[in-house]
């Protein structure tokens, strides 16, 4: 009995050591460009009959670990839908077998029915799509690929939305970018696309919202990547616009160089018919207006990043933009007494303007990459100087009255300095902390000189000085089935402004605290089924561009004016998003706002025929938004992104509660007839909707794009037709304080755009390209 117990004890003690002798296979899986291949199936198979002994799937870094190894003769199989299957023999008797594998792209074309979840990683409030080896990226520009992702759509004004929420910020390798820049990027040159649905604490309060982050494929020493793109657009009644883009990225030694050169010439044409009724004056005025503006815009941005050491990087950016425009407006009007069928008088109005904008921008940045897990220290400093000269001439002629000529000269000047620093600490694979701070300083000067019939009649000035600071913090918890991000931002803003005629500067201080919480429940990892919940407290920006009470002439009977009494609005959003198998998306949002800024219409008490718009803190808003979308393939050659959405809520203003509701559909269809040859068809329909003091008619629009790749996918040709089926845009506006109301009809025009692009690149490796993060966008004024 003693011997039996002793033998059993020896066997128990020996078991862990026997387990330790079992073989383990591990390694990293990459592609021919050195990129990690995620979600690759690694199978251990018997040599005799190829039956599977065990298997694993590689992680997002391409790593795998497979145990235990069989004592029989076996081999490893590496299978991925985008690559050729690789086989590696396992040496018998090995305790530790390290096998790194480089997969080659699949020679056969992968059908669009590939499961998207293989390339998607979901985190709290955001998801990342890997485009390396992704069949969606083949023969597409990035602009065309984005609208095929779950919940995404592109509006007619070329902006993007995710689940009905506008994407307010776009970054390409940390650099703020515009939607137009995305059309010059082949999707296959992009490493990852990250879509952040909800706000985070590092966002300025006014800019909190959805974010799109693009990470380009890396280059090594001597590598380069560029696009030469040009386009020509014609309307159905003549020329519209032309231009070119030339982005270029290079790496030389420890230096990364990026340059974005662009030019555009745009002939903007708008045709309006208006009818304004003045009940208090017993008068109606009917007008036809033609507004034509010629724009010239030249922009160049040069960025240089120096990798001082593998962990320390310095960046410098210089940017310049010059824009000129010539706006012309011609209007003719007929004046009808109330109830009369014949006009009692007529009038004409013409305006001519000449505008020149100069913008200079300088940015410096520092990065300390503390470890390979993502811990880092960031510091950015940004300065922008904007100067403009605007000259206007207004000619007015009314029957029975002498003609009048008024000239205006405006000289706005804006300067902005912004500094930001943040620290990210990855404690372990489950917990990440982030903290940071910001400071800004802004100075705006606007001066208007007015002359009537050649004699100076007035000088108006407006000054604005603002500065503010913010601190914020985030914590991210990551588990296998659950992701949670919680953060808070505290921001202080000081506003000082002065208008000519005031006896002193006006000052206001604002303190705001905005928390945010995002949670993601991963219901089915392999099938891509998740549930996202979010709460975001936010507020509007300091309305510095709406404070000036100086008049800006719009047409013969309209002008706009600011409001020095404006304050930022405040509110919150509640969101829930259910994603089923990376294809179906059901989204719900409830938004609540207080002191909302609305542009209200009033009549001038000194001249009742003149109406003006003025922003006012006047409304309380509550709105429910619901959308259902499907993004996926219908056949091997037809992929769609369809969305049905609707809103219902209320606006409370001027003591009146007004119920509003609207809905619409969005249909995006991507057709691929052959490799490198395809077509995109988009259709949208939106019901009428209403806001305080205005109402919009129902709108529908149909557009189509035909594209072809030539010369081994280096030459890209595109023909796009916009507004093939679109009705006129009709707006009704009224005053809530008097008897003024008007109706404006904007005539829609078809347009056709031909685009040609040449792509050239030489990646030569896998070192990441870094760019200085500019904190501000360059924005020109054309009016």
Model-derived features: positions:
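Short, acidic, small-residue-rich periplasmic hinge/interaction motif at the N-terminus
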Residues: 43-45, 79-83, 96-135, 155-157, ...
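Short, acidic Ser/Thr/Gly-rich low-complexity loop/linker segments typical of extracellular
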Residues: 48-63
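Short acidic/polar hinge/loop motifs at secondary-structure boundaries
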Residues: 142, 148, 175-200, 246
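Outer-membrane beta-barrel translocator/receptor signature
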Residues: 205-213, 220-272, 295-298
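Surface-exposed extracellular loop regions of Gram-negative outer-membrane beta-barrel proteins
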Residues: 215-230, 268-275, 286, 298-302, ...
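Face-selective signature of the C-terminal outer-membrane beta-barrel domain
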Residues: 299-323, 349-500, 524-530, 584-587, ...
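Outer-membrane beta-barrel signature, preferentially recognizing the C-terminal barrel domain
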Residues: 462-466, 539-594, 613-624, 747-750
